[in-house]
Each structure stands twice: as C-alpha cells, then as structure tokens.
From Swiss-Prot:
GO CC terms: cytosol; plasma membrane
One term of GO molecular function: small ribosomal subunit rRNA binding
Gene3D superfamilies the record matches: 3.30.300.20, P-loop containing nucleotide triphosphate hydrolases (3.40.50.300)
Region (G5): 149-151
Species this chain originates from: Streptococcus pyogenes serotype M5 (strain Manfredo)
Protein name: GTPase Era
Length: 298
C-alpha cells in the first residue's frame, strides 16, 4: 500500500521553515538568510520513499503586510490551508508567543484541519524554558501533537517525519521519485542570486530586490550553461549599493551565486548579472506578476 499527503509549513518570518525543508530534502531547494521575509513564494519539497510521499509546502513568513508584495506573500501562505491535510505550525523556542503567533492561531482554528506544533531552535534554550513554551502554546489551541526540533542540527526531525508518515492515508504517488520540487530551474536560479544579495547587503536593500532570469541556455562551444539574470531594485541608491565600488559587490554576488547554481545543475555555469531600477515595483501588481509574484498562486 502506498501512502501520500500534503503538509503545509506555516509560521512567522525567520522561524526556520526553509531550514527544516532543506534538511528533510537533503539539499537546498529553499533559500535562507537571517533577513525576515526571505521566502516570498510557496515552495514545494517532495519527500519520497518506497512506500510514502509527503509533499511539503514551505510558505512565506506570515507578517503584517506593508506593500502589495507583502499582501501577496501572506495570502500565498494562507492559501495552503485549502490544499493540505496537515499543517506544521512552526515557532521558535527562543522567542515568546507574540501577536503574530496569535493571529496565525486564529486562522488555523478556523481552518479545522490537524495542526502539529513544531517548536524549532531547541538547541538555543534550556529544557525548562522549552516546557514553558509548550504549555503556553497548548493553552491557546488543541494541537494534534507537539514536536520540539532543531532544524539546523537535525535533532528530532526523524521523529517528526515518522509522525507524519504514520498518519498518511492511502493515496497516489503524485510526483516521480526523483523529483524534489515543483519549481523550474529558472526559479531556483533566480532565488540563489537573490539569496546572495540578502547575505551581502543591509538595511532596505534586501526587501527591495527581485531577480529575473532573462535567459538560460547551454553554449555548445564552451559546454557551459549561460545564464543572464537581472537584479531589480526600487531606487538608484540601491542600484549603486548592489553594483559596489568598481563593480566589486556585483562580482561577489555573481561568484557566490554561480557556485550554488553549479552544484544544483551539476554543470559549469557562466552567470551574467545586471542591475535595473523599477521604481516602487513592490506596490505595482503588473510588476509583481512580471517578477514571479502572481496571484494565480492562491
């Protein structure tokens, strides 16, 4: 008998949702940074064994939106409640429950589907603090299970996976066993470039960046994959920061991104990066759609 199911990973920004998904999948399919709202699109991670398939849906961190992009991200996250059989509600062990958590809990109660509370970052707290956190969240909602983990170190992750697989129902194998995500390579390439911008820039720049892969094709002469990517920003000052003195920052972004892209593709890559200004794109629906943030996602 083959079992399968869809599982959403929900929570506030920066609680470790993408770190958890990457750990389960054994490779990077969701970019990570210490900046809030790193994940902007729903990202599917397909975990398959001989007898089971769990389709995880990593979601943008739920926050109070200030732009049309923020609205898209939050609606995209909540839309998964209509698509899954189980929700992993992830919270950090080293932060007390806040208004953002309460807002999510109210939506989860209304959804009327099983919710597993996943308390991440247990490596950062004393066991007594962890017990207090569990009691506090349990007082707010009747969770199906509570599982403390460290997504970064992998502590207790196998326990969580076993809990999910034990509760799967008989079903189809929705995806081939060698497929690990639903996103095309172009999307993953654009995310890897954006990840390096997030790592290397500060203040308002990370939130104002989108990356569009203009072309991606193999050069038969050099046997390299030639990629042309444009980094979009909202202001000229941001363009200057990303390019850097004599192009140094842009070169660094390109060099770091190329390494990750080559690992993912298993090919040598020639990465060409450009920077363009598109004023206030985060509040323009046409621009959002052009840059891959389309309401059709939800």
């Amino acid at each position: 008998m083959f079992k399968s199911g869809f599982v959403a990973i929900l929570g506030r920004p920066n609680v470790g949702k993408s770190t958890f998904l990457n750990h389960v999948m054994g490779q990077k399919i969701a970019i990570m940074s210490d900046k809030a709202q790193t994940t902007r699109n729903k990202i599917m991670g397909i975990y398959t064994t001989e007898t089971e398939q769990i389709v995880f849906i990593d979601t943008p961190g739920i926050h109070k939106p200030k732009t049309a992009l923020g609205d898209f991200m939050v609606e995209s996250a909540y839309s998964t409640l209509r698509e899954v059989e189980t929700v992993l509600f992830m919270v950090p062990a080293d932060e007390k429950r806040g208004k953002g958590d309460d807002m999510i809990i109210e939506r989860l109660k209304a959804a009327k589907i099983p919710v597993i509370l996943v308390i991440n970052k247990i490596d950062k707290v004393h066991p007594d603090q962890l017990l207090e956190q569990i009691d506090d969240f349990r007082s707010q909602m009747d969770f199906k299970e509570v599982v403390p983990i460290s997504a970064l170190e992998g502590n207790n992750v196998p326990t969580l996976i076993k809990l999910l697989t034990d509760n799967l129902e008989e079903g189809f194998q929705y995806f081939p066993e060698d497929q690990i995500t639903d996103h095309p390579e172009r999307f993953l390439v654009s995310e890897m470039v954006r990840e390096k911008v997030l790592h290397l820039t500060q203040q308002e720049v990370p939130h104002s960046v989108a990356v569009v892969v203009e072309s991606m094709k193999r050069d038969e002469e050099t046997d390299k994959v030639h990629i042309r990517a444009t980094i979009m920003v909202e202001r000229d000052s941001q363009k200057g920061i990303i390019i850097g003195k004599q192009g140094a920052m842009l070169k660094k972004i390109g060099k770091m991104a190329r390494r990750d892209i080559e690992l993912m593709l298993g090919d040598k890559v020639y990465l060409e990066t450009w920077v363009k200004v598109k004023k206030n794109w985060r509040d323009k629906k046409l621009d959002l759609a052009d840059f891959g943030y389309n309401e059709k996602e939800y």
